[in-house]
């Protein structure tokens, strides 16, 4: 039987790539930048770091990059923390103790410790790595995978590692295409025909469109693969640059384009289509990402058994829907409802309810994100809202129907999304939960 050259190439990849991938992942150290303040999320990050914000009914944002690492076979992971990190650290301790330390696996927390002679906290993304340079070197990686802790997506990092090695890159930058109107929030890049980056501008005021694709810009995902020698040298040089802001997107990547091989890696899903990736750094983006998960066939598939999203699961009973009378029927439509929730003659439509939330009789919740342990009273109407953890909504409350009235008590975004927190209602969640409080 004659085998075509294409089939021969496929067979060769089938038998050789798994070994190569295993070698690459073993030689890779992943570092997750999780120290961001998240000021655009307003009061949602008043007492938690942005990567610790709950999402999708049962997860924290940081669970997505960490799960991507584990599912990709990358089991040496450091998480760099700084801003209001207690709830994040507590979650990492509960959810991510699954590694086998005796075989070299770990999720290690690297808090800002003023480790250099300057005695400063992390001054930027590059400085965060520089202050942990000795720890990186101690693990002897060949490649360092740098990830943001505040993005929602599923991605096999081994494909990016392979691409990095096969293209001979010093740095590989994960990239996605976004509407040019949204590109000012990201690092915008230009590439040549081989996808080598020729220009990189961090958060430009007037982003350029891609050649041949008007209205579309190529932007950075905040995901980088570095070859270790290049990274160590770049970090040391940047640390000594007095005018640097010590940031990868603002300083190291742009300044290295002329002297290093920096490649763009287009993010694709398993079918070769543009992958689902969301920066949930603003309230409207956070709300929309949760709403995306309520669609019939969401672009981000939480039900993929081959790519699970790992997390800590509190021990609550199944969700309960009670009463079946006209005007008092417990039901949820196109929604995600976590364990411990009770819908007592209430209706929920196109919403995400986190664990241990109760909704009282004859209330309606639609197009909303309800964080854990919220109590919604009777005869309430809530729409287009984000209700923070532990909030008690009094009977008869109406939210999301009158922006002017909502703005008197709550935070209302330009898109009309209403953020409600316990503090806005004069409530003290710490006093009510006592020992039950878990961030």
UniProtKB/Swiss-Prot annotation:
Task: Name the InterPro entries on file.
Answer: ADP-Glc_PPase, ADP_Glu_pyroP_CS, GlgC_bac, GlmU/GlgC-like_hexapep, NTP_transferase_dom, Nucleotide-diphossugar_trans, Trimer_LpxA-like_sf
Transmembrane spans: none
Instruction: Please tell me where alpha-D-glucose 1-phosphate binds in this chain.
Output: 122, 187, 202-203, 220
- Which reaction is recorded as catalysed by this protein? alpha-D-glucose 1-phosphate + ATP + H(+) = ADP-alpha-D-glucose + diphosphate
PROSITE patterns xrefs: ADP_GLC_PYROPHOSPH_1, ADP_GLC_PYROPHOSPH_2, ADP_GLC_PYROPHOSPH_3
Pfam families membership: Hexapep_GlmU, NTP_transferase
Molecular function (GO) terms for this protein are: ATP binding; glucose-1-phosphate adenylyltransferase activity
Ordered alphabetically, the record's keywords are: ATP-binding, Carbohydrate metabolism, Glycogen biosynthesis, Glycogen metabolism, Nucleotide-binding, Nucleotidyltransferase, Transferase
Entries under NCBIfam families matching the protein: glgC (TIGR02091), PRK00725.1 (NF001947), PRK00844.1 (NF002023)
The annotated subunit structure for this chain is: Homotetramer.
Family according to the record: Belongs to the bacterial/plant glucose-1-phosphate adenylyltransferase family.
The UniProt function text for this chain reads: Involved in the biosynthesis of ADP-glucose, a building block required for the elongation reactions to produce glycogen. Catalyzes the reaction between ATP and alpha-D-glucose 1-phosphate (G1P) to produce pyrophosphate and ADP-Glc.
Q: What is this protein called?
A: Glucose-1-phosphate adenylyltransferase
Q: Give the species this sequence originates from.
A: Thiobacillus denitrificans (strain ATCC 25259 / T1)
